[in-house]
């Protein structure tokens, strides 16, 4: 027991003995005893208190450990780059095990072909007084400059930076705070002129030149130098930073306010000397194409004529940023006179035409933003309009339809809030066939009827044609049947009334539509819950002044005299209306090919053998069958007129029944017509009708079965309105398929709160 206690005492005595700096391990004991005698000589195991872990906790506090583990935030700049805002790194022993690891990460983040191409090799303090050689020398909240092998360059790196991320800033960073504070106060005083604006910056040099778009607002435009920095990062000049910006007028941008003036396009120059040549201020075709997608909408368009160093004059209006940029700028060439006649292909009634040097920032892929004229003087000395009536009156929205030759955008009347559709036709795509578009527009300009989709307003520029059209959201004729819960013979009678009413009006103007089909009959829903049909798509319409011979239309609805090529007139529309009436009551067409062959279909149409098969027609009134028989007469003279349809008892009186035949008719429609299948959006149906142009109708001009064996009697006479579709040569191949093309469709129409009975059909009286 005594021996054990002696050993313990000696053990603690040994602990109290501190090894001297000069002492060596393994030195002989002062007692001279052997290594096996006594506890001091036989290598006793130290107390657990001397283990590595216990020593750690004895010598380093939790606070010291936490301080070592905490990441230090520091900002790093590029040597000599005054426009670089700096990059903040959180530096900790866990993230960077060595100083070299930090250099590698900085190289990855800061180095490129222009800046630090040899990577980060050296780190200086912000004032360049010394080099940093270890992680321990980096201090919290400080800023440092990264370089390769070059000497430190004295630049005020912190001029445009407000390091709000730093904590307990001391020493050199006080200058950064002072500089940032002065910039902040300067911006605060002069922010009134900053409005959201999208500008285009083109890099100087050999064409083609890169162009970028930058959004400027109160959050992105803090100072002139900061905007230059953003432009430098975006434009990436080969020579490095952007030193100066010039407008297309040749005026140098010297302050932030210059960005928010009348100019939208700027030329970016580097350290090299800028060449003030005429070519620098002229945008070539490829640059115009880039600019065409720059601006989405504009609240107003102004015109000005400031002079530029070159011979041309340029001035542009600020762009309004309220959506995805999609419209275009262009520099079209035109020789048209602004004094053209209203009905000529060169101009449209009631609209001001932009001059030959004028420019429209709209096209079929973008929103209409009518920019200023490049030249304040138009053709023949006429000056451009001071503002765009179209943009002042309407608010232009997103694209809702995109076709082969036109796009359709949302269009809202600013004064009434009423929705319309803006149809934008690209003239470049209509080259050589402008007369077809003009013919269609000239007819739309003439017609004004409650059962016809109306052309509200039109405008023409040198590159685009803008048509504000009535927007019908209720889907087409098939949608009205398939989406309803109840469909009766009386509903079909009202639909035929609306169609006949439109045809009587058109035929009174000697206009034949030639493409009457369910897809072109749109359902207009009124606030009181009532509905009516509106006829659209006048791409094949023309004025009748004599027999027509072009074989065109949709095969299922084409009249026999069109196929026979004996000459036809207005009553081909009555035949098509008769086919539609037949379909409305049973769900399938009166003439159809079992093998889906067009030649068989045409043979049946020419024969004109009309049947009302049981059981589909057992519950249909005789009055309806009588009217259909009168409408589908092969003999044109015996065929009834639109006025006679309106006066027929089945249409004008209550001869129709109220029996619900929705399920039967819908089933047959889905069986025989692809476009009768359920669709997702009723608005897109109306948009697709508006989106079509006369150029889309070329596929509907085909040869009849007699086209190969019989010569044509002659070309159709050209009406006084611009040339019609008749001038298109008849192709050699027939279109496949009697089935009409697919078109999008709607949800069921909403119930009406009052007025007439919800869901009933209006009968407009002339």
UniProtKB/Swiss-Prot annotation:
Residues 394-651 form the Protein kinase domain. The modification Phosphoserine is found at residues 362, 647. Residues 737-752 have a biased composition (Pro residues). ATP binds at residues 400-408, 423. The modification Phosphothreonine is found at residues 61, 666. Residues 24-39, 300-312, 324-347, 724-736 have a biased composition (Low complexity). Its EC number is 2.7.11.1. Residues 72-158, 197-280 form the Doublecortin domain. PROSITE patterns: DC, PROTEIN_KINASE_ATP, PROTEIN_KINASE_DOM, PROTEIN_KINASE_ST. SUPFAM superfamilies: Doublecortin (DC), Protein kinase-like (PK-like). Residues 7-19 have a biased composition (Basic and acidic residues). It catalyses: L-seryl-[protein] + ATP = O-phospho-L-seryl-[protein] + ADP + H(+); L-threonyl-[protein] + ATP = O-phospho-L-threonyl-[protein] + ADP + H(+). SMART domains: DCX (SM00537), S_TKc (SM00220). Protein kinase with a significantly reduced C(a2+)/CAM affinity and dependence compared to other members of the CaMK family. May play a role in the down-regulation of CRE-dependent gene activation probably by phosphorylation of the CREB coactivator CRTC2/TORC2 and the resulting retention of TORC2 in the cytoplasm. The doublecortin domains are involved in the colocalization with microtubules. Binds to and stabilizes microtubules. Interacts with MAPK8IP1/JIP-1, MAPK8IP2/JIP-2, MAPK9/JNK2, PPP1R9B/NEURABIN-2 and actin. This is Serine/threonine-protein kinase DCLK2. It comes from Homo sapiens (Human). The gene is DCLK2.
């Amino acid at each position: 027991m005594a021996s054990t206690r002696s050993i313990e005492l000696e053990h603690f005595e040994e602990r109290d003995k501190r090894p001297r700096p000069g002492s060596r391990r393994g030195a002989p004991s002062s007692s001279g005893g052997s290594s096996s005698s006594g506890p001091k000589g036989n290598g006793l195991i130290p107390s657990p208190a001397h283990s590595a872990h216990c020593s750690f906790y004895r010598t380093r506090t939790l606070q010291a450990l936490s301080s070592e583990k905490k990441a230090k935030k520091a900002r790093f700049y590029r040597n000599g780059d005054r426009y670089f805002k700096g990059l903040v790194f959180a530096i900790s022993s866990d993230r960077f095990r060595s100083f070299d690891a930090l250099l590698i990460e900085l190289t990855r983040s800061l180095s490129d072909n222009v800046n630090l191409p040899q990577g980060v090799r050296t780190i200086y303090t912000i004032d360049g007084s010394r080099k940093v050689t270890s992680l321990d020398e980096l201090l919290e909240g400080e800023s440092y400059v990264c370089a390769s092998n070059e000497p430190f360059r004295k630049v005020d790196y912190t001029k445009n930076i407000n390091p709000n991320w730093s904590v307990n800033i001391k020493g050199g960073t006080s200058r950064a705070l002072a500089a940032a504070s002065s910039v902040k106060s300067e911006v605060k005083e002069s922010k009134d002129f900053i409005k959201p604006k999208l500008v285009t910056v083109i890099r100087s040099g050999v064409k083609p030149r890169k162009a970028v778009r930058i959004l400027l607002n109160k959050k992105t435009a803090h100072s002139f130098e900061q905007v230059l920095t953003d432009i430098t990062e975006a434009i990436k000049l080969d020579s490095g930073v952007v030193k100066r910006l010039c407008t297309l007028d040749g005026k140098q941008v010297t302050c932030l306010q210059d960005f928010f003036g009348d100019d939208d396009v700027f030329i970016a120059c580097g350290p090299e000397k800028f060449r003030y040549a005429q070519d620098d201020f002229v945008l070539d075709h490829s640059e115009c194409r880039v600019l065409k997608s720059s601006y989405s909408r504009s609240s107003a368009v102004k015109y000005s004529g400031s002079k530029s160093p070159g011979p041309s004059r340029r001035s542009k209006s600020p762009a309004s940023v309220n959506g995805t940029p999609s419209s275009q700028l262009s520099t079209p060439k035109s020789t048209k006179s602004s004094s053209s006649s209203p009905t000529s292909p060169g101009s449209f009634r009631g609209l001001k035409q932009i001059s030959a040097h004028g420019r429209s920032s709209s096209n079929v892929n973008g929103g209409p933003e009518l920019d200023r004229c490049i030249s304040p003087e138009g053709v023949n000395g006429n000056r451009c309009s001071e503002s765009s009536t179209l943009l002042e009156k309407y608010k232009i929205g997103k694209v809702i339809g995109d076709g082969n030759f036109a796009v359709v955008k949302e269009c809202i009347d600013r004064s009434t809030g009423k929705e319309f559709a803006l149809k934008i036709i690209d003239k470049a795509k209509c080259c050589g066939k402008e007369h077809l578009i003009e013919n269609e527009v000239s007819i739309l300009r003439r017609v004004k009827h409650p059962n016809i989709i109306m052309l509200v307003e039109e405008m023409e520029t040198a590159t685009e044609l803008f048509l504000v059209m009535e927007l019908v959201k209720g889907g087409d004729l098939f949608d009205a049947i398939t989406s309803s819960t109840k469909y009766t013979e009386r509903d079909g009678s009202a639909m035929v009334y609306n169609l006949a009413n439109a045809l009587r009006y058109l035929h009174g103007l000697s206009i034949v539509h030639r493409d009457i089909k369910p897809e072109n009959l749109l359902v207009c829903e009124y606030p009181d819950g009532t509905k009516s049909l509106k006829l659209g798509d006048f791409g094949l319409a023309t004025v009748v002044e004599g027999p027509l011979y072009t074989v065109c239309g949709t095969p299922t609805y084409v009249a026999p005299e069109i196929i026979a090529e004996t000459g036809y007139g207005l009553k081909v529309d009555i035949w098509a209306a008769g086919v539609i009436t037949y379909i409305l009551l049973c769900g399938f067409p009166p003439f159809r090919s079992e093998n889906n062959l067009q030649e068989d279909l045409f043979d049946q149409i020419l024969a004109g053998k009309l049947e009302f098969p049981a059981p589909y027609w057992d519950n249909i009134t005789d009055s309806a069958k009588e009217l259909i028989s009168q409408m589908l007469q092969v003999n044109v003279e015996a065929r009834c007129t639109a006025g006679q349809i309106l006066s027929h008892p089945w249409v004008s009186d209550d001869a129709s029944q109220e029996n619900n035949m929705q399920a039967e008719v819908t089933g047959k429609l889905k069986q025989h017509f692809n476009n009768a299948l359920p669709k997702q959006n009723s608005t897109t149906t109306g948009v697709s009708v508006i989106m079509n142009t006369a150029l889309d109708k070329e596929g509907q001009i085909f040869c009849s079965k007699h086209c190969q064996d019989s010569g044509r009697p002659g070309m159709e006479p050209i009406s006084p309105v611009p040339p019609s579709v008749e001038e298109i040569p008849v192709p050699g191949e027939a279109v496949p398929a009697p089935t009409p093309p697919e078109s999008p469709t709607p949800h069921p129409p909403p119930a009406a709160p009052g007025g007439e009975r919800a869901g009933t059909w209006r009968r407009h009286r002339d």
